């Protein structure tokens, strides 16, 4: 037994050294005509450059963008996976986003970047992507007006319980935890209804699933040598699998009940009671689009809903934390939090206003503050990553040849902080898009509709926070409406002390993670 524990580390170390030597002597092919950024003249230069990207990826991308990307030139950067990537300039984005999957594949990147092969999933990626695109597009985005009352009701209940209702004294609240709680419960209310969103045991299990699922997708897909992935995959996937099974045990009976309810309504051949519950609408969409599901349908749907919940809640929670960090640390001259309070108070004067979709269109300043925060704080430093599929490679618009298997992408974080596209881009200008929208509406005869392209949920080739083109996030309209309601409710009902400075985000590989230790002081406002 002693010899076993001695031999294993020695063998692993030897294998690691051999792999590093192999990477140095036989590197992945990359375009020789493009400039390199992040590589140095040193022993084991390529492996060391890759290791530096674990904590320094955003800095490398920014340096490359400043030297080459801003001038419209592609460049090559190292990556934690030991596979160099080509970063394209902004003027290549429309070309990149319109290439067919057979030429530039986003699916191949998802499998590797998210560690799909090591996750506890039964369905294949194509099936999941098709399911999410259809369900989100038809069952959620088109029913936002109908589910807004439930969104508001759950936000009110959760914010009140999380931040308190004492108008006499201040209360210390962990911002990240508060946002996660609000997003988790409201998201579950929309997905699964009232029973699960207030089940404390289920919510704790789901939170553990989201944490381990996030760790799986973040760590496994960005681990340096490929041979570490199976090891890390086993270690991280075990708890992920356990919490997924526990979560499915709560969700599956609900799905089965909704399936029986839908079948019963069809058998009655009557209008029945139309339900706007997301699960029910999803089941209707599955039947309508004739999505083929092998095996137990209830288990499949429950699993898909859980992975959808993870994707929606993890990203929206991080975005909400970023937004409030920006709002509370904004320049005192702007008095931003009070400005948003006044806007919300002028719009939401009654319970009916909180449930009215038209109220959302009036939140010009809030929408602008959200878009500005998403612009400045991308959750990923790279965007639109795609893999070259043709065996003979492809030609970039500028004539450079990129070989088969290489990844192309855009340095989204660096691009969205370029003064060429956004004056004073390094600063947080919460009313930037409100001003631009007012200017666009003043110049155009179409009025308010002329500024829609500046809405927080509207992607462009200069605003990739929700990706772009065919890759655009299908749930972005839901996410922005949820964020608007949260900001409005908190601003109307709570005083919050400003932050002296904005805590820096932590970078790990491509991910930019907002502070999860920042605490804020809140107090319930006295309602006149």
Curated annotation (Swiss-Prot):
Lineage: Eukaryota, Fungi, Dikarya, Ascomycota, Pezizomycotina
Major site of localization recorded for this protein: membrane
Pfam families: p450
Name of the molecule in the record: Cytochrome P450 monooxygenase polB
Keywords associated with the record: Heme, Iron, Membrane, Metal-binding, Monooxygenase, Oxidoreductase, Transmembrane, Transmembrane helix
Biotechnology: Polytolypin and biosynthesis intermediate compounds show antifungal activity and can efficiently inhibit the growth of the pathogenic funfus Candida albicans.
Function comment: Cytochrome P450 monooxygenase; part of the gene cluster that mediates the biosynthesis of antifungal fernane-type triterpenoid polytolypin. PolB acts as a hydroxylase and installs the 2-alpha-hydroxyl group in polytolypin.
Cofactors named for this entry: heme
Any GO BP annotation: secondary metabolic process
EC annotation from Swiss-Prot or TrEMBL: 1.-.-.-
Residues the entry annotates as binding heme: 473
GO molecular function, one term: oxidoreductase activity, acting on paired donors, with incorporation or reduction of molecular oxygen
Annotated family: Belongs to the cytochrome P450 family.
Taxonomic source organism: Polytolypa hystricis (strain UAMH7299)
GO cellular component: membrane
Cellular location(s): Membrane
Transmembrane segments: 3-23
Pathway membership: Secondary metabolite biosynthesis; terpenoid biosynthesis
Domain of life of the source: Eukaryota
Protein's membrane topology: Single-pass membrane protein
Gene3D superfamilies in UniProt: Cytochrome P450
Reactions the enzyme catalyzes: 4beta-carboxyl motiol + reduced [NADPH--hemoprotein reductase] + O2 = 2alpha-hydroxyl, 4beta-carboxyl motiol + oxidized [NADPH--hemoprotein reductase] + H2O + H(+); 2-deoxypolytolypin + reduced [NADPH--hemoprotein reductase] + O2 = polytolypin + oxidized [NADPH--hemoprotein reductase] + H2O + H(+)
């Amino acid at each position: 037994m002693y010899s076993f524990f001695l031999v294993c580390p020695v063998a692993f170390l030897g294998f690691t050294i051999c792999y590093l030597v192999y990477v140095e002597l036989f590197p992945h092919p990359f375009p020789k005509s493009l400039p390199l950024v992040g590589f140095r003249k040193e022993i084991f230069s390529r492996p060391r450059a890759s290791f530096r990207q674990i904590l320094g990826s955003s800095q490398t991308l920014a340096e490359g963008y400043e030297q080459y990307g801003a001038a419209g030139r592609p460049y090559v950067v190292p990556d934690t996976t030991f596979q160099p990537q080509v970063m394209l300039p902004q003027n290549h984005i429309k070309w990149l986003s319109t290439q067919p999957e057979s030429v530039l594949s986003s699916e191949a990147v998802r499998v590797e970047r998210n560690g799909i092969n090591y996750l506890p999933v039964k369905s294949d990626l194509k099936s999941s992507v098709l399911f999410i695109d259809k369900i989100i597009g038809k069952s959620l985005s088109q029913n936002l007006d109908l589910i807004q009352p439930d969104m508001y009701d759950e936000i009110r209940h959760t914010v009140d319980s999380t931040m308190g209702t004492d108008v006499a004294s201040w209360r210390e609240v962990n911002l990240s935890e508060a946002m996660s709680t609000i997003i988790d419960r409201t998201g579950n209310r929309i997905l699964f209804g009232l029973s699960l969103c207030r089940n404390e045991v289920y919510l704790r299990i789901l939170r553990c699933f989201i944490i381990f699922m996030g760790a799986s997708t973040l760590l496994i897909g960005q681990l340096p040598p490929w041979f570490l992935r199976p090891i890390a995959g086993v270690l991280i996937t075990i708890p992920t699998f356990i919490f997924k099974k526990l979560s499915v045990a709560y969700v599956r009976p609900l799905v089965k009940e909704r399936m029986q309810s839908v079948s019963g309504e069809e058998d009655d051949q009557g209008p029945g009671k139309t339900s706007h519950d997301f699960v029910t609408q999803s089941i209707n969409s599955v039947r309508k689009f004739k999505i083929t599901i092998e095996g137990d349908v209830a288990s499949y749907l429950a699993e898909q809903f859980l992975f959808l919940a993870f994707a929606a809640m993890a990203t929206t929670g991080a975005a909400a934390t970023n937004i409030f960090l920006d709002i509370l640390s904004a320049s005192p001259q702007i008095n931003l939090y009070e400005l948003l309070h006044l806007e919300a108070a002028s719009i939401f004067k009654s319970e009916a206003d909180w449930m009215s979709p038209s109220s959302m269109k009036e939140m010009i300043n809030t929408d602008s503050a959200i878009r500005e925060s998403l612009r400045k704080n991308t959750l990923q430093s790279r965007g639109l990553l795609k893999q070259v599929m043709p065996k003979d490679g492809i030609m970039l618009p500028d004539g450079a040849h990129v070989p088969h298997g290489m990844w192309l992408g855009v340095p989204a974080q660096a691009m969205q902080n370029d003064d060429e596209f956004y004056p004073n881009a390094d600063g947080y200008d919460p009313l930037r898009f409100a001003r631009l929208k007012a200017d666009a509406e003043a110049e155009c005869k179409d009025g308010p509709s002329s500024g829609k392209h500046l809405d927080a949920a509207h992607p462009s080739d200069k605003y990739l926070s929700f990706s772009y083109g065919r890759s655009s996030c299908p749930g972005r309209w839901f996410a922005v409406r949820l964020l608007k309601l949260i900001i409005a409710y908190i601003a109307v009902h709570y005083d919050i002390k400003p932050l002296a400075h904005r805590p820096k985000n932590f970078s790990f590989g491509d991910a930019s993670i907002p502070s999860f230790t920042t605490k804020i002081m809140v107090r319930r406002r006295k309602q006149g």
